[in-house]
Amino acid sequence: MIKELILAASFLMTPEAMQLGPDVTCMAMNIYMEAGNQSVAGKLAVGHVTLNRVDMERYPSSVCGVVTQGPTYQTKSGMTFPVKWRCQFSWFCDGKADKPVDSITRNESIYLAKKILHNRMYDFTDGATHYHNDQVSPAWSRPVSYTHLRAHET
């Protein structure tokens, strides 16, 4: 729960965004951070992968749970933080600030998150639960089939 609150606080910078609700907020933040510099197709792929995980037993059953999934540690003062580089989505635990700076991309991410969550966008990923930038080669990527979207594979 603490992770979800930290995530929401970093994204809810406008009065309009404060009324989005946790699912839209978490998905929009994931789209922004994972694919903010990608095409609309890349952003949609990230959103669909996030939602596809919610529908599977092996992942948390909420969008925020999926986005913030990963091991955590607690400091002596009781603060909880994600373990660096051990999250499902690398931006969440890379040690960098998670504050959107591009309002146009942030607004587009919110718009797309709403569309995906309200079933108004076709899932062209065919139920994909993973993706990666084609400049990296994670160990999990070898035994799977791909759909290629410019810099991201799903």
Region roles according to the model:
Residues 14-146:
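Catalytic glycan-binding domains that act on GlcNAc-containing polysaccharides
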